[in-house]
């Protein structure tokens, strides 16, 4: 009996060549709607679906393959005598290949002007049903949902006259990944449309971007996946202009650097090591901002990741060229800057649209046996809600330094303390188990520069000991959430030393 293939695709990439290859192997091809029209326009002889079902395509194509003559031909177990007898009695012929991909639901809902009705109309019903039927019966049916697999199937047919069992299994697994991702997109769209923030089940889907050499350490395997609708201002959508392939740690660090530099509207440069900022500088131009970020910690910046929110010019590139860096991220690079930086063959250069998120996306964190979901911390300082409990208010320069430190501290691992002075960070204390420990690290790093600087704390001071350390170092202004039962103790210490202190009412823990 002649083998048969059913071909009905939304993505018509390579389908004409593939069907031509099937026909050359003596395989009969059944097709529907626009796919049939395309194949016939290219001189290929195919059978219309209505000839198989004995029933016309109806309801604007909503019902065309949902028929026993199709699904019987897909689901029949060929070595089951009962199935074969029933097929013969009912005139059902087997279908050996299914070539189907689904209505472009993702592309439809990505359109800015999409209506709910348009989205619903692009939910495929017949396609998923067919490929699931074929995948379930993959011992007898080869099912292809990805044009990437066309050449593999044709090569095996030409060499062996059939598709290998292992290949059929791989193709079947891809089908169920394909339909699961498709249904997840639909589920998420409808959930968002209904305004449900915490549904009883969470479905997520990500698309493979690249395999990585290894994970956080060489003994760990890793892969990079991107969200279907990730913001273009993300590492997932970065364009790499030069350098080695990104590593797992590179991606994490680049993401951290990008998150911080997005906080600034003025020219800014951020240097990151191990997902913590080691230097942040702002200025009237990007060269000045980089100089300050470098001077913030010229030791730790070595081997770091740099993110800038303005084009990298030649002068800045020449400064960057002087030290070893893993990555430089910017919205763009001048041609002269590229010529300078591309002389370092391993330096990775990424262009990314630097744009602060206007709404909080969801952050997913895996834990053993589960997943935590929360909104990203995109909250900026609201000066209308702050309070100043101390006798002295910050000066104009102190306010500038406090705001810079506050923008940075929320991106530092808790317990976090950041010192800033003259448009740059001068000390960062990260990840200590007690707040005063982080303060001591930041103060030690700042050295003499701590005199007259501003301090930001990601959470309140449970005791006045951090204030005491700040006062000894000559720090003159502090910004913190407030809210401790011992706030009065901290206020008294601040007033004793003439420190201006701001309460934001907002905590910025980061773990």
UniProtKB/Swiss-Prot annotation:
Write out the GO MF terms.
IMP cyclohydrolase activity; phosphoribosylaminoimidazolecarboxamide formyltransferase activity
Q: Which reaction does it catalyse?
A: (6R)-10-formyltetrahydrofolate + 5-amino-1-(5-phospho-beta-D-ribosyl)imidazole-4-carboxamide = 5-formamido-1-(5-phospho-D-ribosyl)imidazole-4-carboxamide + (6S)-5,6,7,8-tetrahydrofolate; IMP + H2O = 5-formamido-1-(5-phospho-D-ribosyl)imidazole-4-carboxamide
* The entry's keywords: Hydrolase, Multifunctional enzyme, Purine biosynthesis, Transferase
Q: Which GO terms describe its cellular component?
A: cytosol
Superkingdom, according to UniProt? Bacteria
EC identifiers of the protein: 2.1.2.3, 3.5.4.10
> Start and end of every MGS-like domain?
1-145
Query: What biological processes does GO assign it?
Result: 'de novo' IMP biosynthetic process
Which Gene3D superfamilies does the UniProt record give?
3.40.140.20, Methylglyoxal synthase-like domain
Q: Spell out the coiled coil positions from the record.
A: none
Q: Which NCBIfam families match?
A: PRK00881.1, purH
Q: What is this protein called?
A: Bifunctional purine biosynthesis protein PurH
Gene from which this protein is expressed:
purH
